[in-house]
């Protein structure tokens, strides 16, 4: 059996109107992966004979977005010679941040799109900070709309320098910077003949070289539960994605915070594991599985619980505990003060939390403190805060288990902040 190509998840980030959707559209168009719905529409128009026009396709994609259907991003897939690539989201989508954090979509790499006409803009910075907060290790930069600046190398070099400065201060080291015109198809899939001065990779070549994501098999087992089913003749079947560690048939697993809430171990033996309706003996990180647990009732566990092994159980933050976190405020209408109580979304859990302390404002690029004990924090600020959950929740310090250490803060139907858990303080 030849080894299967690695799967890589990518997100597109960048300032509004810099060309994220057009770049995605061009990638799909030039690799022959335009969504079915659009091909159907095209055929219905009875234009079978005519070739697809890129502009027409982009109009359809735009219409779908305006009707609230982003290019059904969950299914935007294509292949490169050495990778299976899934585009898991493009911002503009209201729940972009929440989706990235709650593990609906763990991104392995980000494509940062910057328009040659504008250079680095506020959202360029915000999205780059966010990529770092979310733990995205690899970035590919495209300097787009090169056709609007006559494919001028000087303009490219100037914008490239701005972006390099921004990303280096955030700790990104090696990243390709590619001059593109998504609208005309320059350097997306096909090499451009308009920029002979550039001899680096096209976007698709850069995507083909994204390092293979490592599977954290040596860490303790963590499976955030998405759903729980009770199946006749089988029993209780929790469903979730293995984030870390491995699960074998015959293992005993314990569920938290269920065990903490019920004051008794909610645990049982794993009788069987299934993935895509096929039985598995062992499940690894990234596997979406259902597993049958003996001795656990469907009413004992729910979405937001996390399964682990009893010798290294998931860490529970109780209502008498607090946790210290670094957050970036993305969108708050006024200001956040002590006492603010929004909802925390982490892995599959959602719990109300309270801001107990605002310890410091920090410079997100260096981590240096810019103000101790601020009275309030507002949109654009990065800060170190202390939060208390109003219900028990499983969280882990980001340094130990990053998959369970990232969270979004939501309120009023929007994502207010993104953050990571620094440490957990047990209360008495």
From Swiss-Prot:
InterPro entries: EFTu-like_2, G_TR_CS, GTP-eEF1A_C, P-loop_NTPase, Small_GTP-bd, T_Tr_GTP-bd_dom, TRAFAC_GTPase_members, Transl_B-barrel_sf
Annotated spans, G2: 68-72
Pfam families recorded: GTP-eEF1A_C, GTP_EFTU, GTP_EFTU_D2
MF GO annotations: GTP binding; GTPase activity; translation elongation factor activity
Annotated segments matching region G4: 144-147
G1, as annotated region: 14-21
Alphabetized UniProt keyword annotations: Cytoplasm, Elongation factor, GTP-binding, Hydrolase, Magnesium, Metal-binding, Nucleotide-binding, Protein biosynthesis
Annotated localization: Cytoplasm
Coiled-coil portions: none
NCBIfam families: EF-1_alpha, PRK12317.1, small_GTP
Family label: Belongs to the TRAFAC class translation factor GTPase superfamily. Classic translation factor GTPase family. EF-Tu/EF-1A subfamily.
Its biological purpose: GTP hydrolase that promotes the GTP-dependent binding of aminoacyl-tRNA to the A-site of ribosomes during protein biosynthesis.
UniProt protein name: Elongation factor 1-alpha
Species this chain originates from: Pyrococcus abyssi (strain GE5 / Orsay)
């Amino acid at each position: 059996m030849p080894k299967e190509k690695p799967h890589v998840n990518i997100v597109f980030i960048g300032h509004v109107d810099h060309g994220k959707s057009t770049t995605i559209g061009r990638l799909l168009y030039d690799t022959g992966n335009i969504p079915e719905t659009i091909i159907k529409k095209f055929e219905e128009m009875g234009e079978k004979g005519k070739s697809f026009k890129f502009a027409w396709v982009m109009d359809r994609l735009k219409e779908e977005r305006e009707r609230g259907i982003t290019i059904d991003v969950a299914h935007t897939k294509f292949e490169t010679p050495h990778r299976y690539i899934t585009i898991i989201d493009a911002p503009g989508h209201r729940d972009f941040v929440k989706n990235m954090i709650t593990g609906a979509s763990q991104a392995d790499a980000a494509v940062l799109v910057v328009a040659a006409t504008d250079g680095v803009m506020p959202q360029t910075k915000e999205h780059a900070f966010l990529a770092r907060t979310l733990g995205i290790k690899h970035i590919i930069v495209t300097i787009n709309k090169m056709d609007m600046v006559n494919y001028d190398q000087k303009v490219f070099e100037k914008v490239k320098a701005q972006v390099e400065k921004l990303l280096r201060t955030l700790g990104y080291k090696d990243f390709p910077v590619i001059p593109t015109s998504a609208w005309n198809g320059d350097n997306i899939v096909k090499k451009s003949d308009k920029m002979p001065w550039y001899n680096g990779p096209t976007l698709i070549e850069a995507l083909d070289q994204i390092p293979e994501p490592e599977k954290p098999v040596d860490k303790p087992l963590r499976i955030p539960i998405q759903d729980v089913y009770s199946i006749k003749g089988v029993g209780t079947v929790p469903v979730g994605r293995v984030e870390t560690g491995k699960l074998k048939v015959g293992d005993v697993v314990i569920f938290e915070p269920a065990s903490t809430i019920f004051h008794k171990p909610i645990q049982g033996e794993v009788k069987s594991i299934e993935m895509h309706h096929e039985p598995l003996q062992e499940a690894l990180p990234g596997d979406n599985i259902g597993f049958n647990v003996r001795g656990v009732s469907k009413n004992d566990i729910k979405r937001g619980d996390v399964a682990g092994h009893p010798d290294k159980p998931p860490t529970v933050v109780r209502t008498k505990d607090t946790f210290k976190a670094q957050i970036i405020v993305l969108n708050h209408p006024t200001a956040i003060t002590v006492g603010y109580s929004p909802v925390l979304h982490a892995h599959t859990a959602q719990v109300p939390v309270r801001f107990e302390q605002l310890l410091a404002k920090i410079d997100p690029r260096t981590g240096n403190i810019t103000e101790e004990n601020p009275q309030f924090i507002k949109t654009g600020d990065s800060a170190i805060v202390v939060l208390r959950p109003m219900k028990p929740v499983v969280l882990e310090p980001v340094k130990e288990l990053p998959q369970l250490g990232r969270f979004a803060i939501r309120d009023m139907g929007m994502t207010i902040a993104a953050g990571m858990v620094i440490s957990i303080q047990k209360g008495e």
